[in-house]
């Protein structure tokens, strides 16, 4: 799904609509960490989100290092392959688990926010082409490095793609957290296994 979602598209959305913020109003972020209903599974899930943000930031820093001449191309290539594979593979697996297992169960817990999980799944479809473009830019740059070709243009394209994805991904992860964590806090007996 792409920008046909209008104002709810990741490209345009500045946050969840008010109708989907009812539970985060009851359970604001400030209370999550110490809340008795924040399960080990939720802590793990939030940690995964942090890791995705950190991996993307590391990819951007490495790319900027190459552009600035602070990174030797072969060292950069090894880091790009390692970080890129972890980021893309883990994020796609994470989204798959959410779409097939997690969201359908959460959707049934509170009808007031049920459509929010459809929105999050649509986000995954909107993010997927950005992930594909990132992989293509990274692979093109890796090929240039292997061939000993100049890297500035390829690194610039990779940086631009990382910046595009960063906005989409941060908006999605933040909105996802604002839906998922409060519904779990409000429903401590929810079966997510």
Residue ranges and their predicted role:
Residues 1-193:
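Small-residue-biased structural context
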């Amino acid at each position: 799904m792409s920008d046909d979602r209008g104002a709810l598209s990741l490209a345009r959305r500045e946050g969840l609509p008010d109708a989907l913020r009812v539970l985060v109003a009851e359970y604001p972020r400030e209370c999550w960490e110490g809340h008795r209903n924040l399960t080990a599974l939720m802590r793990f899930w939030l940690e995964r989100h942090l890791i995705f943000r950190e991996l993307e930031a590391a990819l951007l820093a490495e790319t900027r290092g190459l552009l600035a001449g602070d990174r030797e191309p072969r060292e950069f290539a090894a880091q790009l392959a390692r970080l890129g594979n972890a980021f893309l593979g883990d994020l796609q697996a994470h989204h798959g688990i959410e779409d097939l297992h997690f969201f359908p169960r959460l959707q049934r817990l509170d009808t007031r926010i049920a459509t929010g999980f459809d929105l999050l799944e649509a986000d995954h479809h909107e993010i997927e082409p950005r992930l594909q473009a990132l992989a293509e830019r990274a692979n093109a740059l890796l090929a240039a490095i292997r061939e000993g070709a100049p890297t500035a243009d390829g690194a610039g394209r990779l940086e631009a793609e990382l910046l595009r994805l960063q906005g989409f991904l941060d908006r999605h992860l933040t909105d996802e957290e604002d839906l998922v964590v409060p519904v779990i806090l409000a429903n401590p007996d929810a079966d997510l296994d």
